[in-house]
Amino acid sequence: MTRRYWNINLKEMIEAGVHFGHGIKKWNPKMAPYISAKRKGTHIINLARTARFLSEACDLVFDAASQGKSFLIVGTKKRATDLVASAAIRARCHYVNKKWFSGMLTNWSITKTRLSQFRDLRAEEKMGKFQHLPKRDVAILKRKLSTLQRYLGGIKYMTRLPDIVIVLDQQKEYIALRECAILGIPTISLVDTNCDPDLANISIPANDDTMTSIRLILNKLVFAICEGRSLYIRNH
């Protein structure tokens, strides 16, 4: 994996509040190597470690994107839904930002069937086929389509399992991480001071509660993916 410079600087991370962890009573002892201090009852994350692992993650996604690999971004925290969608669309990644359904990856054959139904319904609506149906049937189909769009809209073009999964909240997306571990899919995860850094292939110690922190980390990763995609296009 080629090491590159991703313009990750301390001042920017401090301004975004990346260094603020949880209260000292809520910590996971496995996070001790990533904590630099305690301040007013709160653990402070070591930003030198954040920069190191964020840089490693950027290198990984750049290399993967330059080879045409696919990505899935998972972040179902309500405040982050729009951020996840816009970042994923910008980098041409799949995303889940509403709810992670258990078995979404491990029961891929079922997920694939649902996605096929979703695409068929969208096509039928666009072609005007709903117009020839009774109003009651149209209402049922539109409700079904709306539900599918809400929960599967971010993965509607996903035809196979992703090559890399990026998780923005380890505790909230624990099931997604476990499914990736079972399937051997590499994962990148933000880990706050109450998380387990051993659950992902690359764990980035960072505040996973503040939007400015999540945005900064995600934007760095998305930039690296976009750079990798550009290289892939130039070479093909």
Curated annotation (Swiss-Prot):
Q: Where is it predominantly found? A: plastid
Q: Name one GO molecular function term.
A: structural constituent of ribosome
Q: Which SUPFAM superfamilies match?
A: Ribosomal protein S2
Top-level taxon: Eukaryota
Gene Ontology cellular-component terms listed: chloroplast; mitochondrial small ribosomal subunit
Q: Where found in the cell?
A: Plastid, Chloroplast
Annotated Pfam families: Ribosomal_S2 (PF00318)
What's any GO biological process attached to this entry? translation
CDD domains per record:
RPS2
Q: Does the keyword Acetylation apply?
A: no
Q: Which UniProt keywords apply?
A: Chloroplast, Plastid, Ribonucleoprotein, Ribosomal protein
Keyword Chloroplast part of the UniProt annotation: yes
Listed HAMAP family: Ribosomal_uS2_B (MF_00291_B)
- What's the family? Belongs to the universal ribosomal protein uS2 family.
Query: What protein name is recorded for this chain?
Result: Small ribosomal subunit protein uS2c
